[in-house]
Each structure stands twice: as C-alpha cells, then as structure tokens.
Swiss-Prot record:
Pfam families: Lipase_GDSL (PF00657)
Protein name: GDSL esterase/lipase At5g63170
Keyword hit for Lipid metabolism: yes
Similarity field: Belongs to the 'GDSL' lipolytic enzyme family.
Catalytic activity, EC: 3.1.1.-
C-alpha cells in the first residue's frame, strides 16, 4: 500500500514537472470572458445560452458538442496549442477535470457574459467579475496538486491570462436595453466598459496574474445577426462603436503596463483580422463572408463544409476562421511573454 502511494506521488510530481517544462516560460493558458473563450462552462448553468447539442461541435476532435460556441475548436484551444501547452482547454466547471488540466490551464469564460452586470443577468450566465470566484477556487485546487505555494505562484504568474469581454455589452445590453442606452451615451458607456476592464485586471493582478492578453471586440456590425438585416452588408454604426471601444481599450492596456509593476498586458486585435476575412473572403479560401453555415433563419439546415464559411452561426466565427486569424496572435503572445 505504501509502495503504491509512493509510486502515485512520483507520477504526479513528474506530471507537474513535465507540464511546467513543456511550455517553457508559459506553463498555462487561463481564459475569462464570453463565448469567444467559453469551452463549456454554460453546460453546467441553468441558462438557455448554451450550445451542448448538434450541430455544434460537429467538427470538434470528438465530433460531439462540448458547449463551445462553434463547429470545432475556439481561440482558447488554438492559443494553448500554438504555445505548445495542449490542444484542448477544458471548462473549469467540467466535472471531468484531471490534475494536469488544472496545471496547464482552464477556461472560466461564460458565453453571453460581459463586463456589465446586466449583460450576464439578462442571460443567466456568469458575470465576468464573478468568474473570479471560480478562479479563487482554482488556485486552491492548484495548490493542493502542486503541494507547494511557491510552485502555485510560479504557474499563475507565468500563465497567460486571455480575456474577451465587451462583445455582448455593446451588441446586446447597450443596443437593445433602454436602461443602458437612455442613461448613457455610447461614449460614456464605452468609458464605463474600460473602467470595468481595468478593475477586473487589477483583481487578477492581486491574485497573482502577471501576463494579460486582452482581446478587443469583433466587428460587431459584420456578424450575420446584424449584417443579414442589410442583405449581407456590415452595419457600420455597430462597427463604429466596436472601433470606439477597441481604441479606448488599447489605450487602457498601455496604462495597465505602467500601473501594475512586474506585469505585462497586450491588446489583441480581433476586429481587423476578422474584418479582413469578411471583406476579402476568397483570399483565405472562404466562399461566404457574412452568411452563416448554421443555426439561423436563413440557414436552418447546416452547410456541408463549415471551413468555407467565415461564420458558423449568427454571432460566432467558424473554426477555420479562427484558425486563420489566431496564428499572428500566438506570435504576438510569444514575442510579448516568452
């Protein structure tokens, strides 16, 4: 019995060592935010904002729906793979987490969420700041696995924290909710969003995080949910608001670098790379720039080949679109944090 315990301990220690060494200076990818990074947390919530059913996930490695808002893998997975950490980033709320999942990173993101508490409340999902409660529990689990607070601190301080928030605040909460759009101008609301972002990053910093990759919003007016109302043309007012927020967010990222000693934050542009696919789809092998493959009134029957479509559904890019725009982001992360 004692021999079995000793052998198990040796194996666990070996797993920890391999995980830390394998990824070099970046041992883990940890994600927060919305459906761009949610790998299945909403499956375990009482919410209608979930996609744990066919045809979602049909091109995933298991050919099954996982709760990811797409036909296959999403940026969380692709970034972790590109950094040499692992191919799949599990959802923190999954009951099937293994020790190595904890060691190499998980996603706390919740599809439909945002920086504004009203955004999450409307959809019954996990508000971005409330995702920190799960992160605190994660730290305790991580510490129990490493058995060493210094190792735990090292993993957290060297992990890359990827954040995607703001898409739903603009597209859903501000544009459709008079409680917000009658009280705030779009200028004051985007200022508020940036302030919420700063507070969230500060909280993560206080919990030991030091490397932040902060994503801007997508070109919201080009999402099929908006563009299809104009016959496939991008809705410029929505894009203008996205650009406004992204400019302010990029400025705030620079402020964070001077505000938080020993940390490094980078702004990750999601807007322009996706807009390029919409404007010049054939250049990257796509045939449909704004018509989704699936799950829309105009496309009730899924397309045969999602890799030819920029968008999977009315709000989310296809796996192929992500595979096209994520490699430069991986390079940016490597150059900034490695």
């Amino acid at each position: 019995m004692n021999s079995l315990v000793i052998q198990t301990t040796i194996v666990l220690v070996s797993v920890i060592s391999v995980s830390i060494v394998h990824a070099g200076n970046i041992p883990a990818v940890i994600a927060f935010g919305d459906s761009i990074l949610d790998t299945g947390n909403n499956n375990y919530l009482m919410t209608l904002t979930k996609v744990n059913f066919y045809p979602y996930g049909r091109d995933f490695v298991t050919r099954r729906a996982t709760g990811r808002f797409g036909n296959g893998r999403i940026p969380t997975d692709l970034i972790a793979e590109g950094l040499g950490i692992k191919n799949i980033v599990p959802a923190y709320r999954s009951p099937f987490l293994e020790p190595n999942d904890i060691l190499t990173g998980v996603s706390f993101a919740s599809g439909g969420s945002g920086l504004d508490p009203m955004t999450a409340r409307i959809q019954g999902v996990i508000w971005v700041p409330d995702q920190l409660n799960d992160f605190k529990a994660y730290i305790a689990k991580l510490n129990s696995i490493t058995g060493d607070e210094e190792k735990t601190r090292s993993i957290i301080s060297n992990a890359v924290f990827v954040i995607s928030a703001g898409n739903n605040d603009i597209a859903i909460t501000y544009f459709t909710n008079p409680i917000r759009n009658t009280r705030y101008t779009i200028f004051s609301y985007t200022d508020l969003m940036v302030s919420w972002t700063q507070s969230f990053i500060k909280e993560l910093y206080n919990l030991g995080a030091r490397k932040f990759a902060i994503m801007g919003t997508l070109p919201l007016g080009c999402l099929p949910g908006a563009s299809n109302a104009l016959g496939g043309l991008c809705l410029e007012p929505a894009n203008a608001v996205a650009r406004l927020f992204n400019r302010k967010l990029a400025d705030e990222v620079n402020n964070l670098n001077s505000m938080l000693p020993g940390s490094r934050s980078i702004y990750v542009d999601m807007y322009n790379p996706l807009l390029e696919l919409v404007k010049n789809p054939l250049r990257s092998g796509f045939i449909s720039p704004t018509r989704p493959c699936c799950c829309a009134p105009a496309a009730p029957i899924p397309c045969l080949d999602a890799s030819r479509y920029v968008f999977w559904d009315i709000a989310h890019p296809s796996e192929k679109a992500y595979q096209t725009i994520i490699p430069p982001i991986i390079q940016q992360i490597q150059q900034s944090f490695a």
